[in-house]
Amino acid sequence: MVSTIGIVSLSSGIIGEDFVKHEVDLGVQRLKDLGLNPIFLPHSLKGLDFIKEHPEARAEDLIQAFSDDSIDMILCAIGGDDTYRLLPYLFENDQLEKVIKQKIFLGFSDTTMNHLMLHKLGIKTFYGQSFLADICELDKEMLPYSRHYFKELIETGKISEIRPSNVWYEERTDFSPKALGTPRVSHANTGFDLLQGNAQFEGEILGGCLESLYDIFDNSLHADSTDLCQKYNLFPDLSDWEGKILLLETSEEKPNPEDFKKMLRTLKETGIFEVINGLLVGKPMDETFYNDYKEALLDFIDSNIPIVYNLNVGHATPRAIVPFGVHAHVDATEQVIRFDYNKES
């Protein structure tokens, strides 16, 4: 299904740095072993400083990745914190719209904003893995659960269903060459946790990293983020959210419970929780603040909205891949999310 995969640095330029070369080389070999032809878009390997200083170059790479018909799939290198800066270079003169076509696009974290950009143009994307975080896993192989979903995506162009992983892993503290071939510390995983509401609900999924969504409404991290996101209407209208399932997951920053509540409150003020069909929430990295987040969700979200917590989606490992814009049937009792590509939500 997928033959050539184009790797883009839309947030951080870290994959161009020497200190991650052992990871990048490993990831490239893994993609080749899967029968893929990986190519790096022209600016993707230019390093942290160049990528930070040149949002227009990042935008050029994304435009090229969509316009180049030899590229079947676009894979984000890694997240970061300022991909919102691509907005004017993609939308001011309809630059992206002129070349846009349905292609597999995969990324997570700060890439949440890129997913929303593509959603504006009607593109269905896939949330949940990136090149450096997943393909370049330092163990002898990709994490088996993560590999299962990546393999299904490249072989079929779809994800048919998501079930819980049997295990979860602690985040590594050492990413140096010394860590090559070493396993992560693993723990038994307890599956999807229905916090409230109906165990079965359905709709198209959209959302992503809570901190990234919060930055659309709060400019304490970047002074111009709210202005740019507002100018280009990045956050979908409430009419767009109606009947959807919101996906939320937290980053490696592991926000403390008060910040988690503040971000939930900001989302609540948009009115989104009045129109969605349900909420899916990823496992926090290292299960930090697991119960605090659970309590906050129950406090803030209206009791009629189903909440399923502890998905293997987001910054905790291993990672499933979630199709956005595809009709999803969630069944917390049966512990499965099924996707129906023939049904319009």
Regions found by a protein language model. Name each.
Residues 67-91:
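Long, hydrophobic/aromatic-enriched structural stretches that serve as scaffold segments
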Residues 259, 265-268, 274, 278-345:
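ATP/nucleoside-binding phosphotransfer catalytic cores, i.e., glycine-rich phosphate-binding loops
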Residues 205-250, 255-257:
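Oxyanion-binding "anion nests"
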Residues 1-70:
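ATP/NTP phosphate-donor binding region
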